[in-house]
């Protein structure tokens, strides 16, 4: 979406907000508006617009994923996991990476390995990304033995990987 279109969406939102009204946006418009906030690193209205989007389109997976990311950002990992579990979509890279990040942050290496093994069994298309994304999280959490084990598992599967 063009910058002018995003500006119009934001202006429409702010005008309605100023008048005490609730504007209507389709799910794609909400997603575009949220994306523009992220790109500009301006989160002044992010929570409000996301809440409005989820109110208008509660079953929209993209908006639910943004809510999960917000939970993770706010370190509310249990809420993020509960929402991830409630989303009926499978084989979704964003959801799987968020789930694994939550397991790392909750110090649940057992669950992380269990879920990773499930992804391996399902021959997940983005399995290499799972290892590349998750290994640094384990290191950041100072779970050094677990990080080493996870990296070794990844190297066993992807011996040519230079990131691991």
Labelled PLM ranges:
Residues 24, 28, 62, 94, ...:
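Start-of-helix register in tetratricopeptide repeats
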Residues 32-33, 66-67, 99, 133-134:
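Structural register within alpha-helical repeat arrays
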Residues 36-37, 71, 103, 138:
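Residue at a conserved register position within TPR or TPR-like alpha-solenoid repeats
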Residues 53, 86-87, 118-119, 153-154:
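Canonical positions in the second alpha-helix
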Residues 58, 90-92, 124-125, 159:
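Short coil turns that delineate tetratricopeptide repeat
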């Amino acid at each position: 979406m063009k910058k002018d279109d995003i500006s119009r969406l934001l202006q429409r939102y702010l005008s309605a907000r100023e008048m005490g009204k609730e504007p209507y946006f389709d799910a794609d418009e909400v997603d575009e508006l949220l994306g523009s906030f992220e790109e500009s690193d301006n989160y002044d209205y992010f929570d409000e617009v996301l809440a409005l989007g989820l109110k208008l389109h509660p079953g929209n997976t993209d908006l639910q994923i943004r809510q999960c990311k917000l939970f993770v950002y706010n370190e509310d990992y249990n809420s993020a996991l509960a929402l991830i579990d409630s989303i009926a979509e499978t084989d979704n890279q964003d959801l799987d990476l968020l789930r694994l990040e939550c397991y790392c942050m909750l110090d649940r290496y057992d669950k992380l390995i269990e879920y990773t093994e499930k992804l391996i069994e399902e021959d997940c298309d983005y399995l290499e990304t799972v290892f590349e994304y998750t290994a640094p999280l384990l290191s950041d959490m100072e779970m050094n033995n677990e990080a080493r084990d996870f990296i070794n598992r990844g190297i066993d599967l992807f011996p040519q990987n230079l990131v691991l």
